[in-house]
Regions:
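Charged, amphipathic alpha-helical linkers/stalks
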Residues: 269, 283-310
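Glycine-rich, charge-decorated loop segments at or immediately adjacent to ligand/cofactor-binding or catalytic sites
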Residues: 115-130, 218, 267-282
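Switch/connector loops and helix/strand junctions flanking conserved nucleotide-binding motifs
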Residues: 81-85, 117-123, 242-243, 268-274, ...
Length: 382
């Protein structure tokens, strides 16, 4: 049986309709993360542990942690789980004990009861923080609360994978790239929302007007933040025509960083930047209701997680094959042929393979340059 890179298990009381709904929502979201091409996307399997598995035993089926390189255990705590807290406490305690001997490759993410019920005794003894769903009263709709839960989960998974695959790299900010002329209001709304004390998701942002210090070299600061972060580009009418916006987008592409385009254009773009494509784009309608912000943040973190998963898998595969490879989390384009100095022999990108038109353009460019570089999807590297 093929071993998954990442699996998510959701633990919830079998008679909890709301927890069951949330679990199905997670299945839908993780069934295709970020960029999708020709119906193919990175999928993270989500499995449930809820109903009793063996007759006479009220506990759910045990989790085979060895079935994946990394397991994420999501606990949906609520009053109905509290009715059988002894059963769930034993189950979670045994599971967390098993996790503890796997060298920190797995992750436990508990979401507290909306009624602020006490944590399971095993978790309380370990001083385990639960996400405070009882404080999400400012979130007006079910969709808002679902997105908040997703933000917590996506951020925790990304941080966990970073601690394993890039432990020495700095914290990753969300770099909000925008044109001052017609994108500043949107950018400021996002940054203010993320940094509001009512928002319990500990995202980091970079917004130039708030971060730059007097006398600082802003170009170097921009570059240092971009090459370690996720770029959220607010593509307004003016965005593609602004040199600094082009610089920020190009820098992120050159560093193979996660990028999401937030399209807020209203009239027209006189000329699109030719290397501002080959990226996921989200149409955003900005209004007084902040729900659009959380949806956009979910898109950014989902694309970031997709890139994290692909990069980890591709680097592992390249190392096992002894390949000196360029690894790009997006389909290759002409721009990518200018980034590496020619030392790599292979460029690895996500499945599926490029279509005929795109591949012909790249192969002609490679032939004209005399460069020897094989373009392979991850599944083609064997």
């Amino acid at each position: 049986m093929m071993r998954d890179f990442l699996r998510i298990y959701v633990l919830f009381a079998p008679n909890s309709g709301e927890s069951c709904r949330i679990s199905e929502f997670l299945v839908s979201h993780f069934d295709g993360l970020g960029m999708e091409r020709d119906g193919v996307a990175i999928r993270v399997p989500v499995r449930f542990r809820s109903v009793p598995w063996i007759e006479g035993d009220p506990a759910p089926r045990k989790i085979d942690l060895e079935g994946a390189d990394h397991n994420v255990i999501v606990l949906l705590h609520d009053p109905l789980m509290m009715e059988d807290d002894a059963i769930w406490n034993n189950y979670v305690g045994a599971l967390r004990t098993s996790i503890s001997v796997r060298n920190s490759v797995d992750l436990y993410v508990p979401f507290g009861s909306t009624q602020r019920d006490p944590a399971l005794p095993f978790d309380k003894a370990l001083h385990t923080q639960y996400a405070r769903r009882d404080r999400w009263t400012t979130l007006k709709t079910q969709a808002d609360r679902d997105n908040r839960l997703l933000l917590h989960l996506l951020l925790m998974i990304r941080r966990h994978l970073k601690s394993i695959y890039a432990p020495s790299s700095p914290d990753e900010p969300l770099f909000v790239s925008h044109a001052k002329a017609d994108g500043d209001g949107t950018a400021r709304a996002i940054v203010d929302y993320v940094n509001d004390t009512q928002n319990d998701v500990p995202l980091e942002t970079f917004y130039d007007a708030m971060e730059l210090l007097p006398g600082e070299d802003y170009e170097k600061r921009f570059e240092s933040e971009i090459i370690k972060g996720t770029l959220l580009a607010i593509t307004s009418d003016a965005y593609d025509s602004r040199p600094w916006c082009v610089f920020e987008l190009t820098t992120a592409k050159r560093a193979y960083r996660p990028i999401v385009l937030a399209d807020i254009a209203t009239l027209k773009t006189s000329r699109t930047y030719p290397y501002g494509a080959n990226l996921p784009k989200v149409r955003v309608i900005v209004d007084a209701d902040n729900a659009w912000i959380e949806k956009l943040l979910v898109e950014a973190l989902s694309e970031g997680l997709r890139c994290d998963i692909f990069n980890a898998q591709a680097r592992r595969r390249a190392a096992s094959m002894g390949l000196n490879a360029i690894i790009t989390p997006r389909p290759p384009e002409l721009f990518d042929l200018t980034v590496d100095e020619g030392h790599a022999s292979t460029l690895i990108y996500p499945d599926p393979p490029l279509g005929n038109i795109e591949s012909e353009i790249l192969l002609k460019a490679l032939a004209a340059s005399g460069r020897k570089l094989e373009l392979k999807t991850l599944s083609e590297v064997r």
